[in-house]
Amino acid sequence: TTVTAMVGAMLRKANWNVEVAGNISPAVLNALMHCMDTNHWPQAWALETSSFQLETTAHLNADVATVLNLSEDHLDRYASMQDYTLAKARVFLHEKTGAGIQVLNRDDPAVCAMALTDRKQITFGLGIPPTSIDFGILHEDDDTWLMEGDQRLMKSSELVVHGLHNAANALAALAMCRSVGVSIA
């Protein structure tokens, strides 16, 4: 929910017309019906989808998608972690081969294993970014910096939400926005 809200806020700050929907509310179908009724279509959708919703999704065709982490919190619904992982990975399904960018949490090996060979990947994590297109953290003196490659973006203390988990959320949102062409400055 935090990352979806951050993506929506960042896109709006970049003057994009964006519709934020899904688990975050409103429901995707309600938001879609509103757009149909008003004939007002956004430039972008920022959607939060659950593994439950993805089970019946043939393909999302997202320009960019992410799985933030995998944990055992839904094993009451799934027979195994593998089944849960397969459901979550459906967010990356696309009709066109090679289409859609994957934003992957490099601190979660199970998420990294979702990398598709025909897709571009951008990673985020709580360490120094391994390449110029990846996002991460630099700890320097008493400061913690959010980074894109070797470029310092902002101090984590400047985030409205605090904690390393929220720094990771911000990095994921930054990676998603960058991947669709939003300037980060």
What is each model feature region?
Residues S80-Q82, K120-A185:
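Adenine nucleotide phosphate-binding catalytic loops in nucleotide-utilizing enzymes
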